[in-house]
Amino acid sequence: MNLTEHFTLEELTHTDHREYDNTPNDAELENIKRLAEFLEEVKTVLGGKPIMVNSAFRSKQVNDAVGSKDTSQHRIGCAADIRVPSMTPDQVVRAVIASDLAYDQVIREFDRWTHISIPNEEARSPRKQALII
């Protein structure tokens, strides 16, 4: 199911932990749609370069299986771990920070990917936190 021009529901709910159900509920699906729209904005800021999604929505079971916290924004469909093949994670983080995107968090994780998120609620103001792990 296409959520936007470049992002599908399958892509944003994919997991290698196929033994667990990773189907979002209605509220999570709405967040995933907002996330897909936001990723389109990120793609524009990055000059239209392809964005590879490593991980986005995670059901509780999937989130537990990967050892993430219950408070992870992935749990509710508000975060994605991405790679941009022609850019380093540092370049992605810098481009996002320099933009006027309404990101909640942008995190360079282990110099392998970039975690990017939107506010948990549509009406909530973004925190605009930038971190390096």
Predicted regions and their residues:
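Extracytoplasmic cell-surface/polysaccharide-interacting catalytic and binding patches
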Residues: 1-47, 131-133
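Glycine-rich, flexible loop/turn motifs
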Residues: 3, 62, 71
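N-terminal start-of-chain detector that recognizes signal peptides
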Residues: 25, 51-57, 86-91
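Amphipathic alpha-helical interface surfaces
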Residues: 31, 35-38, 62, 78, ...
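Extended, low-complexity, intrinsically disordered C-terminal regulatory tails
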Residues: 40-67
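Catalytic cores and adjacent binding grooves of peptidoglycan-active enzymes
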Residues: 71, 76, 80, 84-133
